[in-house]
Amino acid sequence: MKNRSRSQWISFLLSPILLAATSAHGQESDAEALAKAAQNPIASMISLPFQNNTNTNFGPQEKTQNVLNIQPVWPFSAGDNWNFITRTIVPVMSQPALTPNGSRTEGLGDITFSGFLSPKVAGQWIWGVGGIGLLPTGDKALTADKWGLGPAVVALTFNGPWVVGGLINNVWSVSGSGPNDVNLMTLQPFLNYNLPGARYFTFAPLITANWEAESGEQWTVPLGVGYGKIFKLGKLPVNGQVSLYHNVVKPTFGPDWQLRVQLQFMFPK
């Protein structure tokens, strides 16, 4: 009887500790699941990323360019078997002068809108197909002044702690009064490694090819690495990320380095 009473008291005293440990493990598992969802461009989750890109030695004057991309992601159900995921990029720009006597230009750039049709039940690979649209919303000197359309594809897979995939699109101008046609490819491969505690390393360079540019001036190819972590503001989960990239291939007046800082506010179901 004494032994049983003693064991009951020990269980009673330890129960708050065990409950707290179980709760902490559950919260950590939820955070790690959110970390992987944040790394899926077509996750069925509303999110609002603010991505700030600081580009050094940009333009003929070799000054700093800054682009804040506001990138809301909004998924919709498209029947029993499909989701339709929208991704909008609204750039707020601060661009240095491109001529010796010019001045810095600040304002809104051209908005891009992408939509992907993706299966609700994924196999080993998660994928989406759709299109991209270019809207001439930019302020003067920050716009191509062209409407554009093109295809867009994304695919990724999870393998243990690894996330591997990529996103590609190409937009062509279809109308508008701008003097130059638009024919621009954007490719973003990504390779992420997830760590305990909802932390991860990321490699997600934004590779572009301006097919309208002269030979030798078309490609921008960055290489670098970043670090991210899921944390909470109150009850709201946030994906914080910092990355640094060096453009190993670039046009003559393209930037040398890019510092990317992102806060992604997530609204899971």
Give names to the regions the model predicted.
Residues 2-13:
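Bacterial N-terminal signal peptides that target proteins for export
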